[in-house]
């Protein structure tokens, strides 16, 4: 059961850095819907992308799965024999709740939920890999290596979905979209105190990149085809396809 996010509604004397702990996991569905513009669209359309890219007898990876929203969207939209979804997150609280969510919805495609570091997970025989608002929480020096590993583990014709909060090389545009995002949160009931305190906790943990930086990394990893397919304010998603024919 999801609860309304009121974690930052009262002043917090010592904020510290952001962690995906039990308190965050409990309110996460409400938090992300009210904080990330276009989130529901991205989740539903990941299912549509899965219909197009997932192949029989292959694996789907949801790297940084949180509560499993993307995994569930994929599973609702595929019915190929021999497919398996592997969902990974390093937060024990998220993994525990993710397993409950997955178990609550019965479907023929098996899902394995793993508590672990995505940097340590092997990607093999993949037709679809999802990095949904995950890269931004990794150390910048680790980001290229993850994308390299994803590319190597994808089968020809397979796809990566990479969703992120973006920074912008044009400072004027960046400020406009930053302010519109805050307007979005205000419209969803967050107070100035809540917005400010959450931002303070995230600023040393969530380090954003520009769309151009993401595309450059994808090219370096080997992807010949990569483009932004969805954007709302300073949030969006790219799809990158590995060249070659699907088996």
Swiss-Prot record:
Classification via Pfam families: Methyltransf_25
Q: Which reaction does it catalyse?
A: prephenate + S-adenosyl-L-methionine = carboxy-S-adenosyl-L-methionine + 3-phenylpyruvate + H2O
Instruction: Please tell me which top-level EC class this enzyme sits in.
Output: transferase
Entry's family note: Belongs to the class I-like SAM-binding methyltransferase superfamily. Cx-SAM synthase family.
What is the protein's given name?
Answer: Carboxy-S-adenosyl-L-methionine synthase
| Lineage of the species this protein comes from | Bacteria, Pseudomonadati, Pseudomonadota, Gammaproteobacteria, Enterobacterales
- A single GO BP annotation from the record? tRNA wobble uridine modification
Per the UniProt entry, the Enzyme Commission number(s) are 2.1.3.-
Keyword Cell inner membrane tagged:
no
Q: Which organism is it from?
A: Klebsiella pneumoniae (strain 342)
Q: What does this protein do?
A: Catalyzes the conversion of S-adenosyl-L-methionine (SAM) to carboxy-S-adenosyl-L-methionine (Cx-SAM).
Q: How does this protein assemble?
A: Homodimer.
SUPFAM superfamilies of this UniProt entry?
A: S-adenosyl-L-methionine-dependent methyltransferases (SSF53335)
GO molecular function: any one? carboxyl- or carbamoyltransferase activity
Instruction: Show the InterPro entries listed in the entry.
Output: CmoA (IPR005271), Methyltransf_25 (IPR041698), SAM-dependent_MTases_sf (IPR029063)
């Amino acid at each position: 059961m999801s609860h309304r996010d009121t974690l930052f509604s009262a002043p917090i004397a010592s904020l510290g850095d952001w962690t995906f702990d039990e308190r965050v996991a409990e309110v996460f569905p409400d938090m992300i819907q009210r904080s990330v513009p276009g989130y529901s669209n991205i989740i539903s359309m990941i299912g549509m992308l899965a219909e197009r890219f997932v192949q029989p007898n292959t694996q789907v990876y949801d790297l940084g799965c949180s509560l499993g929203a993307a995994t569930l969207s994929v599973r609702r939209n595929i019915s190929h024999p021999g497919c398996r979804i592997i969902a990974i997150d390093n937060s024990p609280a998220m993994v525990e709740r993710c397993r409950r969510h997955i178990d609550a919805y019965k479907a023929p495609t098996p899902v394995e939920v793993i508590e672990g570091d995505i940097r340590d997970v092997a990607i093999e025989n993949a037709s679809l890999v999802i990095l949904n608002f995950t890269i931004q929480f990794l150390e910048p020096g680790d980001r290229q290596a993850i994308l390299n590993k994803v590319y190597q583990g994808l089968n020809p014709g397979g796809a990566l979905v990479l969703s992120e909060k973006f920074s912008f090389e044009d400072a004027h545009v960046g400020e406009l979209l930053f302010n519109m995002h805050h307007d979005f949160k205000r419209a969803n009931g967050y107070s100035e105190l809540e917005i400010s305190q959450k931002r303070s906790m995230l600023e040393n943990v969530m380090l954003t990149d520009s769309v151009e930086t993401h595309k450059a990394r994808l090219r370096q990893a080997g992807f010949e085809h990569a483009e932004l397919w969805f954007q709302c304010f300073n949030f969006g998603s790219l799809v990158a396809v590995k060249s070659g024919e699907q088996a």
